Amino acid sequence: GSIGVFAATIAFFVYRAFGSMMFGPTATASHVLVKDRARAEALKAEIEADVAGGAPLRAKFARVAEQHSTCPSAKKGGELGAFKPGQMVKEFDAVVFSGEIGAVLGPVDTQFGSHLILVTDREEAKK
């Protein structure tokens, strides 16, 4: 039910806030969180079709996040801001810190549901 979604969302942000704060690479990303993989795959196909038809990727991704994502970040078009490894769940981190920048990645399944991820920037570790 909705209590479970609320608890999972709170856990996600608590994990983010108190995760590793070490120096390291930083990524900036947006995501769409939905309950199941089939829904995520359908939304990814919709995004890719619209972009192939000339729609700007970031704007389309943000619209899909606002309309379909169950994460509170939906209000900001799915934007998660900048974060370091260890601030997100490991399945999410693995994709964000290795996947292509500027492409729709996923679906990535975590304990929260199925994510589509758009990495908008990544900086290597500061020396």
Locate each region found by the language model.
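Proteostasis/folding factors centered on peptidyl-prolyl cis-trans isomerases
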Residues: S2-R37, E91-K126
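Second-shell loop/turn segments in exported
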Residues: A29-L33, E41-G53, E79-A82, A103
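A general structural signal for well-ordered alpha-helical packing
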Residues: A40, K44, F61-A62, D93
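A generic "cationic amphipathic patch" detector
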Residues: A45, G77-G78, D109, K126
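Peptidyl-prolyl cis-trans isomerase
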Residues: A49-E91
